């Protein structure tokens, strides 16, 4: 009986969702390899860049609670899965 109870406790702990933390890219380069673990409440990954520049685009990537607004001539892309803001 104790073995069954212990097994049920272990299975319950393993199956519990102990919280999910989103991971987003966070760097200004086109080919970004730096990751950031988002803070509690940040459920969005974003990527911003200036649409006017063909070469040397400066990207801004990171985590956010909501999708940031685009400024004039700026493109913003948002998503909500791990490392989706490539």
Curated annotation (Swiss-Prot):
InterPro entries: Snake_3FTx (IPR003571), Snake_toxin-like_sf (IPR045860), Snake_toxin_con_site (IPR018354), Toxin_cobra-type (IPR054131)
Pfam assignment, any one: Toxin_cobra-type
Compartment(s) where it occurs, according to its Swiss-Prot or TrEMBL record: Secreted
Keyword Repeat set for record: no
Keywords carried by this UniProt record: Acetylcholine receptor inhibiting toxin, Disulfide bond, Ion channel impairing toxin, Neurotoxin, Postsynaptic neurotoxin, Secreted, Signal, Toxin
GO molecular function per UniProt: acetylcholine receptor inhibitor activity; ion channel regulator activity; toxin activity
Entry superkingdom: Eukaryota
A GO CC term attached to the entry: extracellular region
Disulfide bond annotation, renumbered to this chain: 24-45, 27-32, 38-63, 67-78, 79-84
UniProt note on tissues of expression: Expressed by the venom gland.
Predominant location category: secreted
Signal peptide stretch: 1-21
Protein family according to the UniProt entry: Belongs to the three-finger toxin family. Ancestral subfamily. Orphan group II sub-subfamily.
Its biological purpose: Binds with low affinity to muscular (alpha-1-beta-1-delta-epsilon/CHRNA1-CHRNB1-CHRND-CHRNE) and very low affinity to neuronal (alpha-7/CHRNA7) nicotinic acetylcholine receptor (nAChR).
The name this protein goes by in its record: Weak neurotoxin 10
């Amino acid at each position: 009986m104790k073995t069954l109870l212990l097994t049920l406790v272990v299975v319950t702990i393993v199956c519990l969702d102990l919280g999910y933390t989103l991971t987003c890219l966070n760097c200004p380069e086109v080919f970004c390899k730096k990751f950031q673990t988002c803070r509690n409440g940040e459920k969005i990954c974003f990527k911003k860049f200036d649409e006017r520049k063909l070469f040397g685009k400066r990207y801004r990537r990171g985590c956010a609670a909501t999708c940031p607004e685009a400024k004039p001539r700026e493109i913003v892309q948002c998503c909500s899965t791990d490392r989706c803001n490539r």
